[in-house]
């Protein structure tokens, strides 16, 4: 039986930190679903369709990754995808409390759904999509933090 995992997020936009996590997840699980949340309340810069397209392009080198947009409750989405593992990245201790709350709620809603926490590689441990966008808005060089296709799309959005 294939072990299916979901790595959810808004990915607005997907960064090299996200790519680091999903790449390592592909080595742990047979199939990884990069689940891109619609998250309208976060007022994303990129549409859901754009974020899905950018993530698909950025993960083409990973044969066991499927990129899917979703707007459902995570536990319901996981059940529909036949996934039993939820991957979450933890950048700092500050992330842990919120992630623990989510993990407990997801387990309440779907007892067979395990949350697995991965720390990003040191190189990416301090970045977030929000930080990258903010630096780019002020003409800072964010090339190092984004896949090339994402960097081009971000620069086009900010032009």
Swiss-Prot record:
<dbReference type="GO" id="GO:0004595">
    <property type="term" value="F:pantetheine-phosphate adenylyltransferase activity"/>
</dbReference>
<keyword id="KW-0808">Transferase</keyword>
<feature type="binding site">
    <location>
        <position position="88"/>
    </location>
    <ligand>
        <name>substrate</name>
    </ligand>
</feature>
<comment type="function">
    <text>Reversibly transfers an adenylyl group from ATP to 4'-phosphopantetheine, yielding dephospho-CoA (dPCoA) and pyrophosphate.</text>
</comment>
<keyword id="KW-0963">Cytoplasm</keyword>
<feature type="binding site">
    <location>
        <begin position="124"/>
        <end position="130"/>
    </location>
    <ligand>
        <name>ATP</name>
    </ligand>
</feature>
<comment type="subunit">
    <text>Homohexamer.</text>
</comment>
<keyword id="KW-0067">ATP-binding</keyword>
<feature type="binding site">
    <location>
        <begin position="89"/>
        <end position="91"/>
    </location>
    <ligand>
        <name>ATP</name>
    </ligand>
</feature>
<feature type="binding site">
    <location>
        <position position="10"/>
    </location>
    <ligand>
        <name>substrate</name>
    </ligand>
</feature>
<protein>
    <recommendedName>
        <fullName>Phosphopantetheine adenylyltransferase</fullName>
        <ecNumber>2.7.7.3</ecNumber>
    </recommendedName>
</protein>
<feature type="site" description="Transition state stabilizer">
    <location>
        <position position="18"/>
    </location>
</feature>
<dbReference type="GO" id="GO:0005737">
    <property type="term" value="C:cytoplasm"/>
</dbReference>
<dbReference type="GO" id="GO:0005524">
    <property type="term" value="F:ATP binding"/>
</dbReference>
<comment type="pathway">
    <text>Cofactor biosynthesis; coenzyme A biosynthesis; CoA from (R)-pantothenate: step 4/5.</text>
</comment>
<keyword id="KW-0460">Magnesium</keyword>
<keyword id="KW-0173">Coenzyme A biosynthesis</keyword>
<dbReference type="InterPro" id="IPR004821">
    <property type="entry name" value="Cyt_trans-like"/>
</dbReference>
<feature type="binding site">
    <location>
        <position position="99"/>
    </location>
    <ligand>
        <name>ATP</name>
    </ligand>
</feature>
<comment type="similarity">
    <text>Belongs to the bacterial CoaD family.</text>
</comment>
<dbReference type="GO" id="GO:0015937">
    <property type="term" value="P:coenzyme A biosynthetic process"/>
</dbReference>
<feature type="binding site">
    <location>
        <begin position="10"/>
        <end position="11"/>
    </location>
    <ligand>
        <name>ATP</name>
    </ligand>
</feature>
<feature type="binding site">
    <location>
        <position position="74"/>
    </location>
    <ligand>
        <name>substrate</name>
    </ligand>
</feature>
<keyword id="KW-0547">Nucleotide-binding</keyword>
<feature type="binding site">
    <location>
        <position position="18"/>
    </location>
    <ligand>
        <name>ATP</name>
    </ligand>
</feature>
<dbReference type="Pfam" id="PF01467">
    <property type="entry name" value="CTP_transf_like"/>
</dbReference>
<keyword id="KW-0548">Nucleotidyltransferase</keyword>
<dbReference type="InterPro" id="IPR001980">
    <property type="entry name" value="PPAT"/>
</dbReference>
<dbReference type="InterPro" id="IPR014729">
    <property type="entry name" value="Rossmann-like_a/b/a_fold"/>
</dbReference>
<feature type="binding site">
    <location>
        <position position="42"/>
    </location>
    <ligand>
        <name>substrate</name>
    </ligand>
</feature>
